């Protein structure tokens, strides 16, 4: 089973479990801005919790594949060891991407909490929207359903920013990849890399092919 197939099956399973909870729409513009920010926070936390489950399942699969690499090497079946090692490398690549997404969303949640309590919506949400747009794009081929949900979240936040801009007399918004958004994602990637080193054992050298090193 490939890493993408495993992740797809996990996603379908938990989509059923979370049915009715995860499909909460960002309230329409008639609702107060603060209430809609709270709803956005809830939605982000839900994504973080689901990512925890996905990452846990990927760790389980990683453990199985790692053991198969070792067993194949012990039996001197290097071609099979390389096959398992390549799949293991793919699992870890996806897991790091999920960890980076989770850590970045944790930062988004904190920013939304700050905005909800202290205000200054227009200035503080622009970087958040940039982060969400980048995560949405990066997850399209890995977790399409989460990518779609991030797109919906981004649209809801864009409505909030537009309204906040109207109230403050500011016109025009940009959810581009701002320096602050870039910093959030870069820091998330660094933390994810560190967690990968802590959670996953190094691959046996003989099982690492040129494909894994690239």
From Swiss-Prot:
It comes from Sulfolobus acidocaldarius (strain ATCC 33909 / DSM 639 / JCM 8929 / NBRC 15157 / NCIMB 11770). Disruption phenotype: Deletion mutant forms small colonies on selective plates. Forms enlarged cells, with a highly elevated content of DNA. This is Cell division protein B1. GO terms for biological process: cell division. InterPro entries: Cell_Div_Machinery_Comp (IPR053492). Induction: Expression is highest in dividing cells. Keywords: Cell cycle, Cell division. Part of a cell division machinery. It comes from the Archaea.
């Amino acid at each position: 089973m490939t890493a993408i197939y495993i992740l797809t099956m996990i996603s379908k399973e938990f989509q059923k479990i979370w049915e009715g909870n995860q499909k909460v729409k960002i309230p329409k513009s008639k609702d107060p801005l603060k209430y809609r920010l709270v709803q956005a926070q809830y939605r982000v936390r839900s994504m973080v919790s689901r990512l925890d489950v996905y990452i846990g399942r990927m760790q389980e699969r990683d453990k199985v594949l790692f053991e198969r690499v070792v067993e194949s090497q012990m039996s001197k079946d290097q071609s099979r060891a390389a096959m398992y090692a390549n799949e293991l490398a793919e699992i870890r690549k996806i897991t790091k991407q999920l960890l980076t997404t989770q850590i970045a969303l944790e930062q988004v949640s904190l920013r939304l909490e700050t905005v909800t309590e202290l205000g200054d919506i227009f200035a503080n949400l622009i970087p958040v929207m940039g982060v969400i747009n980048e995560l949405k794009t990066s997850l399209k081929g890995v977790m399409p359903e989460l990518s779609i949900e991030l797109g919906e979240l981004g649209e809801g936040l864009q409505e909030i920013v537009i309204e906040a801009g109207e109230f403050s007399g500011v016109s025009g918004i940009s959810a581009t990849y701002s320096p602050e958004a870039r910093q959030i994602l870069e820091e998330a990637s660094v933390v994810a890399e560190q967690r990968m080193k802590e959670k996953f054992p190094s691959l046996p050298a003989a099982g690492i092919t040129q494909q894994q090193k690239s």
